[in-house]
Swiss-Prot record:
This is Heme A synthase. InterPro entries: COX15/CtaA_fam (IPR003780), HemeA_Synthase_type2 (IPR023754). One of its GO terms (biological process) is heme A biosynthetic process. Its cofactor is heme b. It is found in: Cell membrane. The chain crosses the membrane at residues 32-52, 118-138, 149-169, 184-204, 226-246, 283-300, 309-329, 332-352. GO terms for cellular component: plasma membrane.
């Protein structure tokens, strides 16, 4: 990502008899400002994903039964309000079947995490909307970018609605958790919003791709890697949704078998059968890691800018694979699992940055253009 920042902030050069004079143009300053705003939003979404993971892992997600985008901003301020919310929670199956009798103090414990998760979502909305208005009014955003940013804002609003749609599935009779399908949709919307912001920010910083002749194959491999990362994260969402990580806590075998007993049983085995869901996630993670490392090796052989483009991807995929194993062996210990979920976003980041850095694959530098440093 540093290459993109250097590209945006690289000064224009004006020849003079005394040497070079350096200046950053107003357009470059505006691009850096806009990109910094979008990178801030990306960081906030990363935190949001980790908060969501902690909320799910601690069973806190169903503690607030009301959808109040504005009035729900403030927490309860009186004993009467706490008791009212606790009485609502006592009506859902999760209380009766999982947390029966844990008292108002126990309810407060799970309430605060879900409330923080929702509050952070509201803050993301404000950080998205208010600077967007300011930057547009002061004409710091290039006009061609405004429709895309409005679409991103709409996507952010939809994500909030999808979040409630997911939570509501946990209020059904005999339900003690949210629907894994709705959980995956909620996660997918978050990552789609994150990816759109990140790609746009990188493009704002570096609107003209750097020529990288002879790297078309590397770009294709990086695109395949990004696709595999996305599919593997979605598969991980189903692992989380049906709590498949609580079984088969050995690696690399599953109860002493490469392919676990019961694999593929049921017409929705890919989404609801625990051995199938966990094995598929393991297989996809391994395929993703191998593809990313192969992409990295190709980039290293090319050297120069290609090597710099693939290095973050190689580091991220190794760390994420190790965290996945650690999460499994720890029987989904909450701190390890939350870091694993956050690292998935960082791996997605590395894959996007790598692909974006290779936009100039196959292009040759102009004769009059300054040679890029290697």
């Amino acid at each position: 990502m540093s290459d993109h920042i250097r590209a945006a902030s690289s000064p224009s050069r004006h020849g003079s008899e005394h040497g070079w004079q350096h200046a950053v143009t107003p357009q470059q300053r505006n691009r850096i400002l806009v990109a910094t705003w979008m990178f801030t939003l990306c960081f906030m979404i990363l935190v949001m994903v980790m908060l969501g993971g902690a909320t799910r892992l601690t069973g806190s997600g169903l503690s607030i039964m009301e959808w109040a985008p504005l009035m729900g901003t403030l927490p309860p301020t009186s004993q009467t309000e706490w008791e009212r919310l606790y009485a609502l929670y006592q009506k859902i199956p999760q209380y009766a079947l999982v947390n029966h009798g844990f008292g108002l103090d126990g309810f407060k414990h799970i309430f605060w995490l879900e409330w923080t998760h929702r509050l952070w979502g509201r803050l993301i909305g404000l950080v998205l909307l208010l600077p967007l208005i300011f930057l547009a009014v002061t004409r710091r955003i290039e006009r061609s970018l405004i429709p895309r940013l409005i679409l991103i804002f709409v996507l952010g609003g939809l994500q909030g609605a999808v979040g409630w749609f997911m939570v509501a599935s946990g209020f059904f009779p005999d339900s003690t958790a949210v629907s894994p399908y709705r959980l995956v949709v909620h996660l997918s919307f978050a990552l789609l919003l994150y990816s759109a912001l990140l790609w746009t920010a990188l493009s704002v910083l570096n609107p003209e791709p750097r020529p990288l002749p002879g790297t078309v194959g590397l770009r294709r491999m990086s695109a395949v890697t990004l696709g595999l990362v996305c599919i593997t994260i979605i598969a991980g969402g189903f692992v989380a949704g049906i709590h498949a990580g609580l079984d088969y806590n050995t690696f690399p075998l599953m109860d002493g078998r490469l392919v676990p007993e019961g694999y593929g049983e049921g017409h929705r085995a890919m989404f609801e059968n625990i051995p199938t869901v966990q094995f598929d996630h393991r297989l996809l993670a391994t395929l993703t890691a191998l593809t990313a490392l192969l992409t990295g090796l190709i980039g290293f052989r090319r050297g120069g800018n290609a090597r710099r483009a693939v290095l973050p991807l190689m580091v991220a995929v190794i760390l994420q694979y190790a965290l996945g194993i650690a999460t499994l062996l720890s029987v989904v210990a909450v701190p390890v699992a939350v870091v694993h979920q956050g690292m998935a976003v960082l791996l997605l980041t590395a894959a996007i940055v790598t692909l974006h850095s290779l936009r100039g694959a196959g292009r040759t530098a102009s004769i009059n253009a300054p040679a890029s440093s290697h």
